[in-house]
């Protein structure tokens, strides 16, 4: 398996949605290989399918979001509500699970394993919590996962807190879970963590877990 990596820097959420849509169609048509898009977003709250009809997990008013410069978008991914912003590494794998990887549960667990390995590369012991999606250190979420799969081609993906301003998570109930916290690599390590190093570690871990040969890096 070959995967083409794109490291795009800071990209507005709406622009990234359009890019994903185009890449998904290209992948379905076999015009491109599997893709791994790595980027950051300006401050934005996104609503998964669980949150589109019930926004009670968005705690801030529209006026407060506007005052803080935080956008709000409905998405087609699974899950509830989450926050994206600068200092958070967002990954959008556009991967064709045909013909022998048609297992949504396995795919999500594999994404978790990628992020567990990334954390380990920085000396952090992260893991899973029973019944919950994502990657955790104790009772604090380090990385969130929310995916969409259409005709077995994936989109959306994961968000790893590197140097995220965690105060923005006070605007929401992250992933609809009220009794857990959030954390970041920088908070756990007590030092700055270069985003480029995290991107490189993510590419390495993704290649290992998915048995992929990265190109374009």
What residue spans do the PLM features occupy?
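Non-catalytic surface loops within mature trypsin-like serine protease
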Residues: 97-99, 149-151, 162-164, 189
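N-terminal lobe of the biotin/lipoate ligase/transferase fold
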Residues: 1-136, 141-142, 167, 192-196
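C-terminal accessory segment of soluble enzyme catalytic cores
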Residues: 166-217
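A short beta-strand motif that forms part of the nucleic acid-binding face
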Residues: 51, 149, 176
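Short, conserved beta-strand/beta-arch hydrophobic-aromatic motifs that form part
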Residues: 56-57, 61, 142-162
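A structural signal for short, well-ordered beta-strand segments
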Residues: 91-93, 133, 145-147, 158-162, ...
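Intrinsically disordered, low-complexity acidic/polar segments
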Residues: 100, 154-156, 169
């Amino acid at each position: 398996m070959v995967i083409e990596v794109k490291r795009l820097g800071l990209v507005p959420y709406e622009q990234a949605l359009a890019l994903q849509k185009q890449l998904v169609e290209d992948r379905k048509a076999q015009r491109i290989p599997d893709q791994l898009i790595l980027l950051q977003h300006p401050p934005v709250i996104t609503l998964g399918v669980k949150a589109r009809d019930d926004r009670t997990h968005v705690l801030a008013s529209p006026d407060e979001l506007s005052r803080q410069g935080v956008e709000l978008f409905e998405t087609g991914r699974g899950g509830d509500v989450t926050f994206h912003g600068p200092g958070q590494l967002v990954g959008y794998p556009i991967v064709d699970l045909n013909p022998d990887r048609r297992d949504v549960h396995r795919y999500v667990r594999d994404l978790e394993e990628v992020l567990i390995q990334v954390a380990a590369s920085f000396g952090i012991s992260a893991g899973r919590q029973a019944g919950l999606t994502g990657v955790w250190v104790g009772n604090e979420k380090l990385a969130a996962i929310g995916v969409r799969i259409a005709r077995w081609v994936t989109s959306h993906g994961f968000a790893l807190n590197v140097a995220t301003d965690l105060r923005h998570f006070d605007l929401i109930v992250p992933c609809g879970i009220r009794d857990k916290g959030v954390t970041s690599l920088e908070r756990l390590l007590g030092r700055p963590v270069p985003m480029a190093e995290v991107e490189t570690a993510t590419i390495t871990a993704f290649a290992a877990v998915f048995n992929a040969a990265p190109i374009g890096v």
